[in-house]
Amino acid sequence: MNYNKKSIEDIDVKSKKVLVRCDFNVPLNEGKITDENRLVGALPTVKYLMEKGAKIILCSHMGKPKGEPKKELSLLPVAKRLSEMLNKEVVFADDDNVVGENAKKAVEDMKDGDIVLLQNTRYRKEETKNEEIFSKELASLADVFVNDAFGTAHRAHCSTVGVTHYLKEAACGYLIQKELKFLGNAVETPERPFVAILGGAKVSDKINVINNLLDKVDTLIIGGGMGYTFLKSLGYTVGDSLLEEDKVEYAKEMINKAKEKGVNFLLPVDITIADRFDKDAEPIVTEDQNVKEGYMGLDIGSKTAKIYADAIKSAKTVIWNGPMGVFEFKNFANGTIEVAKAMADSDAVTIIGGGDSAAAVNIFGFGDKMSHISTGGGASLEFLEGKELPGIAALNDK
């Protein structure tokens, strides 16, 4: 995939109507936004366009309204909060049809530097099917398209891909530019040693990621629930731990591939186990890689955490996707904390691949110590799988 895409700085936006696809899919509680990270992430692009005198039309989806208006998934709270953050009114074009009379009128009345936010794009069933009719309607509002929603870049929808067929100029915003810089460099031209850490519950979620990264990394570290399928493939007992029986053979193949490629493949040498899945369960650290009957692995052990931390310390590039254990339970958060700490203390380029690892890093207070925290869980996984992301591919090359 070509990562060298035109950015907003490469196009003249003065007095032009610029449709910006943002990711405002934020959590709401009784109409209040509970996590503003995605709004903060959009600000640099919006501010740049304001300064350059563009007419800014923002659009995004929120949740899954399944192609019909749902009041609780309206973007009104986003418009209100953005107005406060930008110190400028963001006009909300409340329109069940997204591009109806309200939206058209709001756009018509715009002056340079003004901002309009359209209603939830998924109010229209055509959006997720990438149907021409809605793509054309969205494109009809603007002269230029800017995609700044990395979180939906792996989806070919009207507001991410379809519009680019009807607007000649399509560029990326600062958020996507940063994602492409960090993830693209890591996958294509990493500084070495290059270490990837994969955790989370399932091997099946990361099959293509493991396979693709083994062609690129110097060390691959495995933790989390997926580790037990690998340990089982080596003949260890896993007790009641999470196990994907149908992936044991695949795990064996990957361990062999690592040997062939000369990749250092690290698995847990000890495990923090408990007799039940409960935040108050007593944590016991095993002597070796075996989990006894009646017990389940809920975190990597302390010896393993030290080995993983040492591997991170010697790296020049580190990518992490997926926690080492059940970090939501204090008794089983240590492995995840130790990995985050080692990355925070490192001089390497450190990249967190979105999702649960991003949540963990922020909860434990290491967020600002990382080089980059990806804003897209699914998108960053597909990126690491080596797949082309439709929302990026659709933009103009430099």
Swiss-Prot record:
Substrate binds at residues 23-25, 38, 61-64, 122, 155. It catalyses: (2R)-3-phosphoglycerate + ATP = (2R)-3-phospho-glyceroyl phosphate + ADP. It holds the Pfam family PGK. Its EC number is 2.7.2.3. InterPro entries: Phosphoglycerate_kinase, Phosphoglycerate_kinase_CS, Phosphoglycerate_kinase_N, Phosphoglycerate_kinase_sf. One of its GO terms (cellular component) is cytosol. Pathway: Carbohydrate degradation; glycolysis; pyruvate from D-glyceraldehyde 3-phosphate: step 2/5. One of its GO terms (biological process) is gluconeogenesis. It is an enzyme of class 2 (transferase). It comes from the Bacteria. Gene3D superfamilies: Phosphoglycerate kinase, N-terminal domain. Keywords: ATP-binding, Cytoplasm, Glycolysis, Kinase, Nucleotide-binding, Transferase. It is found in: Cytoplasm. GO terms for molecular function: ADP binding; ATP binding; phosphoglycerate kinase activity. ATP binds at residues 206, 297, 328, 354-357. Its main location: cytoplasm. Monomer. Belongs to the phosphoglycerate kinase family. This is Phosphoglycerate kinase. It comes from Clostridium botulinum (strain Loch Maree / Type A3).
